A protein has these predicted regions:
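Histidine (H) residue identity feature
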Residues: 1, 39, 74, 105, ...
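Aromatic-rich carbohydrate-binding modules that target alpha-glucans
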Residues: 5-26, 80-128, 138-161
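A short, amphipathic beta-strand motif
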Residues: 73-79
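Exposed beta-strand face motif in extracellular beta-rich ectodomains
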Residues: 129-133
């Protein structure tokens, strides 16, 4: 967990215990992690409690496997607990392989049944940074994008560095 120490010395610990990196699974000499604070008061955290995960949302979980490129420069990880059955997270953006936001070139994110994270490995070595991107909801049964997340585009300022993987 992350710990925020305020100017007065008071400590605030972020919520959750699911942010784990398996360093043995990452084949590189350098790792850069770009993460966000998870405040305990965020209402979304209630959907990761045992009552929701084991009972109320158990039927809606969809596991999905994706292939990784031979060379990986960036790994995107995101959680989304309130998807319907057969829905997964996808990613699109201004990078080359997404064909500049094309809805026919979406990147479907993989998810194992035991993990709360959707994950996608990409090779962005031929792209210009910064890169704009968004997550979306994709229906595997309908084979189409349902919607992109609301709000401004996310921006990735972390370019490819030799022998480094960036985890977002």
């Amino acid at each position: 967990n992350y710990v925020l120490v305020n100017a007065d010395g008071a400590k605030v610990i972020d919520w959750g215990t699911d942010r784990v990196l398996d360093l043995n699974a990452i084949k590189t000499t350098k790792i850069q992690v770009v993460d966000t604070w998870n405040h305990a008061g965020y209402f979304e955290n209630s959907f990761y409690t045992e009552a929701f995960q084991q009972v109320l949302l158990a039927e809606s979980k969809t596991a999905y496997q994706v292939k990784s490129p031979k060379q990986v420069t960036h790994i995107f990880r995101v959680k989304s607990p309130l998807l319907s059955k057969n829905q997964v997270i996808c990613l699109s953006g201004s990078f080359k392989d997404a064909e500049n936001w094309s809805e026919t070139h979406l990147f479907i994110m993989g998810k194992s049944a035991s993990s709360p994270f959707f994950e996608l490995s990409l090779n962005l070595s031929k792209d210009q940074f910064p890169i704009a991107y968004k997550y979306g909801v994709y229906d595997l049964e309908l084979k189409k994008l349902i919607q992109f997340e609301a709000g401004d585009n996310r921006v990735l300022h972390h370019p490819v560095i030799k022998d480094q993987i960036t985890i977002v």
